[in-house]
Amino acid sequence: MGKYFSDAVDNAIEAIYYTYDREKAAAAVQPLADAANAGDGDAAYILSRCVSGPQYSWDYHPFQANDEAVEQLIRQSIVKGSAMGVLGAMRCGMLTPEMEEAMPFANLREAWNVVYEKAQAGCLFAMNMIGNTYFWLDIVRVEGKGPNDFPSKEAFGVWLRESELKCLPWFEKAFAGGMGFAGRNMYNLYNDGEEGVIAPDKSKAEAIARLGAEKGYPDWQERYAGFLISKEGRAQEALDLYFAAAKQGQLSSWFYIGKAFQEGKVVPKDCPQAMKCYELGLQDPNAIGCANRAGELLFHGKDGVPQDYARAVQFFEQAHAQKNTWGNDMLGTCYLFGYGCQKNPARALQLFQEVDYSTNLLNFGLGTLYTEGLGVPEDIKKGVEYFQKCKNYAPAQEALLKFK
């Protein structure tokens, strides 16, 4: 038996929530599954979190979301007597009356007390769970209280506010104790504030990020670097933190490192190195920024990066598939002129019309489409107006000579 739960559960919580190690997290899954199959309800609950999506653990753990498995595992955890499973089900809206009836606890308070006692005993994961029952006000359901239990609506509101703020000491203990994940809701509460509960306090939010960075949590190193990058004289410190985070597997940090090499403000400009950083970031297929910036370097093909329109199209399409239009002017230009892809004026027009920005490439592309009637009825006047919007752009100036 482990310190707080079974060995399999304690070891899994350690690997998944107290470290940022993909291999350790992956290795914890099979022992969890074996324990769950043997009737360990807590193991089933931790497994359910693994397949619930990145919002339930570190973004870069090697888990795949599976909604069907989540429901099955949550149900299994409750039936097998997991108090964590009960609180987790309540938090994600899965604690139906049927599920509540199936739990081997007299009431929700009894289940809450089990987790609370483990939090009191020092379990960081349990501390975070108790903090969340206050933060999300699940404690209202646990306590079984409502407006009619108070002398006035105002008194009920005061109780709600006081209850929500009780989350902070629990989050603070878990975060400082080694659970980087526990800082998320605490940070959001200070950074964004909540009307009627707490005013935004950016300095406290920054302090949380700084503490996380000092403790070596890669996601918090990245977040704190975001505070430092705009502060005078601290850009190099920010870049060092991005490097530290990236080396621990925080793939999103490669975007900021690549951007630093591409822009050459903090370090000497080195676009080939920037390209390498973006490609490292693209180990995460959802890395929109890296896809766009890599596409930009390949589209222009300068500063040491060979021009490669076909790869540029691939990267821009990857970003566009996630509803991002940052590179639409370049992607549309590729489709308009057949750079690295088949010519497709209709697709180019669609891409140009999706954006809310204005660039020379965009205006030149629209000017070309309208003056040549490509994919749209020819409209010389409209096309010329687009050419005229271009600023110091030789292709547009050359095109205008045809319409004097």
Regions found by a protein language model. Give the residues of each.
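TPR/TPR-like (Sel1-like) alpha-helical repeat modules
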Residues: 71, 75-78, 378-395
